[in-house]
Amino acid sequence: MEAENSEVAALVEKFTGFHAAISKLPSLSPSPQVDALFTELVAACVPSSPVDVTKLGPEAQEMRQDLIRLCSTAEGLLEAHYSDMLTALDSPLDHLGRLPYFDNYINLSKLENDLLAGHMAAPARVAFIGSGPLPFSSLFLATYHLPDTRFDNYDRCSVANGRAMKVGAADVRSRMPFHTAEVADLTSELGAYDVVFLAALVGMTSEEKANTIAHLGKHMADGAVLVARSAHGARAFLYPVVELDDIGRGGFQVLAVHHPAGDEVFNSFIVAQKVKI
């Protein structure tokens, strides 16, 4: 136990250092300095760790919450940068390998599809909430795994949607409409979907995440499936954690939980089914 506590303390100290360094950056837009620092940060999260971020002290929790906010901002700027770069090219899909973490998106979409396939037939309609300016997740699922499925993509930022709708082949884009909306404003629409994906950065705090899941549970159809991206171990310094208790309180039954090992996939995810009350 003492060794574990020492390991956690060392980890908190390391991420406190990252937080301090990132906070001093003049900009979080992609640059050699920003890219190098975030690459180092991501690498520090990959090894297995005993840390449970819910048990951190107030000061460490405050640091972690602000680090998640900084990472969210940087990720949005990174995706916007590469979305603009891709759509300026004649054949954007031929250049996807240029993007950082490209393999992560490929592997994550395959894992999520494989787990879904174990619990349901191919869905007719899917919603992706928090699709962002570079909608790789829905793009890869629509292209490689679910060729007959319609993907409705929701993001609260109209500029992000404007970028996103230019990415992808025309035949896939016809099945991938984009809508500008806050998740809290989606009600009857949610009842039309067989599957709802919840992006990792929709709901930045534990309370926001719990409220979002409760809202989805209130409006999704009975039997529909929620795929909620989360984080585990040291990766929870970069992304919010989805609590299984909040999944249950939202009216869902957990079907599967996946925590990745190694660096092939970064996010954890939870597959849960809306139960009839």
Regions found by a protein language model. Name each.
Residues 133-148:
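Conserved SAM-binding loop of SAM-dependent methyltransferases across substrates and taxa
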Residues 150-155:
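Conserved SAM-binding motif I beta-strand of class I
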Residues 163-192:
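S-adenosyl-L-methionine
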